[in-house]
């Protein structure tokens, strides 16, 4: 059990008999005195895959569920299933393409470090990605000479098909760091 203001992204809650995974949280602070802060949470139903949105006051109690997190690496594709291998005991975890379609946009060829699978009582629930990923731009308009760092943005397409806005001075072939949750450009990769 936890109060709504203690819930974080990636946690699991039991709400109305449904097992929900917290995908995103928006905090809305009212300007009126005495009004309580609202937490607008977006969930993914673990069993059906449907997206659910709910609002809670900060002091509302939610039934949290303890999940097991295991570090994994991408292994191979088998038909429409993506297989991830446990880093410690090499247990394979299979996901259907539809289950992780959103996450696949951020996984470069060859995988990435920091991925985890979430399980509960041996049941595979979700794939969790790290906060950032470094990816190479495959397509964008040519860079403009003399474009300042605070100039306009332009769309850029990554090797996975992901499209994000980047500054005008970035050119194709450059590696950039992307904030996964916010889907935004953070800077050039080291």
From Swiss-Prot:
It comes from the Bacteria. SMART domains: EFP, Elong-fact-P_C. It holds the Pfam family Elong-fact-P_C. GO terms for biological process: peptide biosynthetic process. GO terms for molecular function: translation elongation factor activity. GO terms for cellular component: cytoplasm. Belongs to the elongation factor P family. This is Elongation factor P-like protein.
